[in-house]
């Protein structure tokens, strides 16, 4: 018997009055009203929902939008991870509802807008759930004689999931060294064998189509080509040629950006929504000269756009027409080593560089939680997550 989906009314944030006289102009941070004008930028900021617990929008390259709704992960109660489930908020009305009602924690960022489904994994079982009616189906049970399989993304037409298999030896390394700073360098220097696989979402058939002794990670399907997958060689960025694509039917990898100098780094790559370009954070060399790189998927032609040190962001993303970019800033201890880039930024093209507009002052945000910006499909708002009120919540700033 299906559990009835709970629909709760929240703030109708995108239909609020534009009358600035009713909206306070204040510093962003601490206990905030439901909407305010950022004192330092003049841009309106709103809290997406009023819901107990932590509310977390997706990682920057995972598309959360289905129609008028945005899918997100939320904890029930006091923000305990073990109580997390999947929710959706209507960006037109402000209503939010719970999608999953599992007896175990569910966190996923795998969403197909075309089929209106989310995909998630519990132990070795892979499930799909219809966002609109809550219908759930088991797709497959991943079996590995020596290791573990994890799903990572779904293609644009919802026909294939992609993921990685790792060995028991690699899994044991994570158990033995739970802190990232311990195992990260180990895997860079001495990676284990990994496999890329797909799952047919209708039949459950699993296809291991590529393997390499490398830390294969950061999987993303093209938003327009259902057979084109991007993946990375994970590790210390100055030691790896990171960004690759592969046709999942053909199984032949293609390097999309090759480092050209010592200590050059390129990463946090993403597909533009139009499917023609791949973008990435580029530093030549690391911590010295900063760019956003853009490579044409068909031709391999690359163009790099310069930004200032104080404008660097942990993550960048593009608008839906790819005519401007958004960045989420960074902490003073990030790779840019600058105490002036704690902002949500807008970047507009200006020849071979990007000119910047500041949207939100993030000086009261702890960047151990990365904001991970998303532009709404109407290109009018930027959604981000933040903890400047003492817990993880979701906000939107008006462009």
Predicted ranges, named:
Residues 22-28, 75-81, 163-191, 232-240, ...:
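Short, conserved, GDST-rich strand-edge loop motifs in beta-rich repeat architectures
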Residues 54, 58-61, 81-126:
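Blade-loop segments of beta-propeller domains
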Residues 262-264, 304-317, 351-377:
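Conserved blade-ending motifs and adjacent loop-strand segments that build the rim/top face
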Residues 369-399:
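Blade-level signature of beta-propeller repeat domains, shared across WD40, Kelch, NHL, RCC1
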């Amino acid at each position: 018997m299906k559990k009835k989906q709970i629909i709760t009314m929240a703030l109708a944030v995108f239909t609020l009055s534009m009358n600035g006289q009713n909206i306070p102009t204040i510093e962003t941070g601490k206990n905030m009203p439901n909407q305010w004008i950022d004192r330092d930028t003049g841009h309106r900021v709103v809290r997406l929902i009023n819901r107990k617990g932590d509310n977390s929008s997706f990682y920057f390259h995972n598309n959360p939008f289905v129609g008028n709704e945005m899918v997100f992960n939320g904890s029930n109660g006091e923000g305990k991870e073990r109580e997390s489930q999947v929710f959706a908020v209507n960006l037109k009305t402000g209503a939010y509802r719970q999608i999953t009602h599992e007896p175990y924690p569910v966190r996923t960022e795998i969403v197909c807008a075309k089929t209106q489904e989310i995909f998630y994994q519990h132990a070795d079982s892979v499930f799909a759930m219809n966002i609109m009616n809550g219908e759930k189906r088991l797709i497959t049970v991943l079996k590995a004689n020596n290791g573990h399989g994890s799903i990572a993304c779904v293609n644009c037409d919802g026909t294939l999931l992609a993921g990685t298999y790792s060995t028991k030896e690699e899994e044991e390394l994570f158990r033995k060294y739970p802190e990232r700073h311990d195992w990260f360098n180990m895997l860079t220097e001495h990676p284990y064998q990994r496999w890329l696989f797909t799952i047919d979402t209708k039949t459950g058939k699993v296809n291991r189509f590529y393997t390499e002794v490398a830390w294969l990670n950061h999987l993303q399907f093209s938003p327009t080509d259902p057979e084109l997958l991007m993946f990375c060689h994970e590790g210390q960025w100055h030691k790896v040629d990171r960004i690759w694509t592969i046709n999942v039917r053909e199984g032949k990898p293609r390097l999309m950006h090759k480092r050209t100098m010592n200590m050059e780094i390129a990463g946090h790559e993403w597909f533009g929504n139009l499917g023609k370009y791949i973008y990435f954070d580029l530093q030549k060399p690391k911590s010295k000269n900063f760019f956003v790189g853009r490579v044409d998927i068909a031709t391999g032609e690359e163009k790099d756009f310069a930004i200032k040190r104080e404008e660097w962001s942990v993550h960048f993303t593009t608008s839906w027409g790819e005519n401007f970019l958004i960045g989420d800033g960074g902490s003073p201890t990030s790779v840019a080593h600058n105490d002036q880039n704690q902002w949500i930024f807008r970047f507009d093209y200006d020849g071979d560089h990007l000119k910047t507009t500041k949207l939100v002052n993030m000086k009261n945000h702890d960047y151990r939680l990365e904001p991970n910006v998303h532009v709404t499909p109407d290109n009018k708002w930027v959604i981000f997550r933040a903890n400047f009120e003492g817990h993880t919540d979701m906000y939107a700033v008006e462009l």
